[in-house]
């Protein structure tokens, strides 16, 4: 037996706000050009800024969209999560790409923010935090499952829980034209200079100078890249 008559009657009796929520839930998780248009239209009305030519995939979750800015041609693929917990929020500059399942979280605190530069590629499953700020320079590449955490728990007092002891945090900067391989972890004590390369699976605990190649746990510089400066910025 068809449920169509029951559904039609229920739909007609549904308050306008509930109908709107239903439509939103459908197009947020639908594929196709129409659903994409509706998602972008919806987020453009509630975000700080949405540029032209933006792509927002299925199942994208954005918390506090009023603190999120997307430049022209930004791509946010399926199942990404953006947690803009602070007013400084999250900025994706023109041409930045987040692949499937990327997680961004500014965390708490007034200084929390994430700024991702032009044409930056963030691979599937990356997890990036911005406790005291995270900045990634133009044209950098992050392979799958890279983790960047500008925070470290304090655990000096064994009589107290680790959680209750708080921790240390600072702004972390990834320079322009960097390449971080798969499963790289960048800890709170490390910055990465322009043009540096970090090999897959490395754990970065100290600053990496510009144009260096670093590998290992902990990551150590094994050589310098040829050339005197990072590649020039790619034209728009």
Language model regions located:
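Basic, gly/Ser/Thr/Pro-rich low-complexity segments located predominantly at protein N termini
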Residues: 186, 204-206, 221
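Terminal amphipathic alpha-helical/low-complexity segments used for targeting or macromolecular assembly
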Residues: 1-53, 139, 145-146, 150-159, ...
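Short Pro/Gly-enriched beta-strand edge/turn motifs at strand-loop
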Residues: 54-55, 77
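C-terminal/domain-terminus segments
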Residues: 191-215
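Long amphipathic N-terminal alpha/beta scaffold segment
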Residues: 43, 49, 55-67
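Flexible, glycine/small-residue-enriched loop-and-beta-strand segment within the central core
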Residues: 61-70, 75-190, 217, 225-233
